[in-house]
């Protein structure tokens, strides 16, 4: 399976284009948002035969259903739909998106796997069993991790298996600025040439978390073996600080799992800008 990446910049650009085609004003209201979720758990067998392998798709999609600001609600739904299901669903109703996405997944599974499965069945030895690699699954589960004043942190967890030694999983975060109706990027939070200094802080925090004192010791443990340790746009804000979230293979091998590095605000004061959202979190 190919690793699934979500580009925050691509999400911002695609959704912004949709939103500004609908409305050219930004409302500063944080929205009094209320949320619900749409849940799907469907299993579909090859050839509709329960004796044959199947795919399973699980969706738990959290989304705003009520707000004092309809444009804010629509904006958030566009971003959430984009990051969970892809740009082509932007502008559709959440219920229709989830239903269509699940249907497309099942249809594609059968279209791709049934011919190969039939060929394997035809060519197998009389007592052989066609491999379990035809049993696929996919889950997309999202929730609101934090909603406070002008900030909403939205988390999406993906998990997928398409044959092979193991499945793939990853988590993606959107830190929504509700006044601007778009996700925050590192450039919105930090000032100046922050990259090098922030990289040093991440290394130092990783060393502290792992009770070692050198970069080499971290590298011996497996850190930085699959990618450079540097600030990532996949982060989330909390009252404790900023957490940089590295999915499997970003900086470590699969066996080490994802890596979270939380830097307290007090350690980054010299790098932080004057974004009011940070002030609200630190109060």
PLM regions: where:
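Compositionally biased intrinsically disordered regions enriched in Thr/Gly
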Residues: 22-283
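Bacterial Sec-dependent N-terminal signal peptides
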Residues: 1-34
């Amino acid at each position: 399976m190919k690793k699934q990446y979500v580009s925050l910049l691509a999400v911002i650009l695609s959704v912004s284009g949709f939103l500004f085609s609908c409305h050219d004003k930004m409302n500063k209201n944080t929205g009094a948002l209320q949320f619900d979720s749409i849940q799907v758990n469907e299993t579909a067998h090859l050839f509709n035969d329960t004796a044959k392998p199947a795919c399973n798709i699980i969706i738990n999609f959290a989304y705003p259903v009520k707000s004092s600001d309809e444009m804010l609600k629509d904006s958030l739904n566009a971003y959430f739909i984009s990051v969970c299901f892809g740009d082509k669903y932007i502008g559709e109703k959440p219920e229709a998106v989830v239903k269509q996405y699940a249907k497309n997944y099942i249809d594609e599974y059968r279209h791709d796997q049934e011919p190969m499965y039939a060929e394997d069945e035809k060519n197998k030895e009389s007592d052989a069993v066609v491999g379990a690699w035809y049993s696929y699954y996919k889950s997309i589960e999202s929730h609101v991790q934090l909603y406070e004043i002008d900030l909403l942190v939205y988390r999406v967890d993906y998990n997928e298996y398409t044959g092979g030694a193991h499945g793939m999983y990853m988590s993606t975060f959107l830190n929504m600025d509700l006044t601007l109706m778009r996700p925050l990027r590192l450039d919105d939070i930090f000032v100046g040439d922050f990259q090098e200094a922030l990289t040093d802080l991440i290394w130092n925090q990783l060393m502290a978390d792992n009770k070692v004192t050198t970069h080499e010791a971290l590298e011996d443990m497996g850190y930085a073996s699959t990618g450079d340790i540097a600030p990532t746009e996949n982060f989330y804000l909390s009252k404790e600080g900023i957490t940089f979230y590295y999915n499997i293979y970003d900086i470590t091998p699969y066996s080490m799992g994802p890596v979270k590095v939380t830097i307290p605000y007090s350690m980054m004061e010299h790098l932080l800008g004057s974004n009011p959202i940070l002030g609200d979190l630190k109060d």
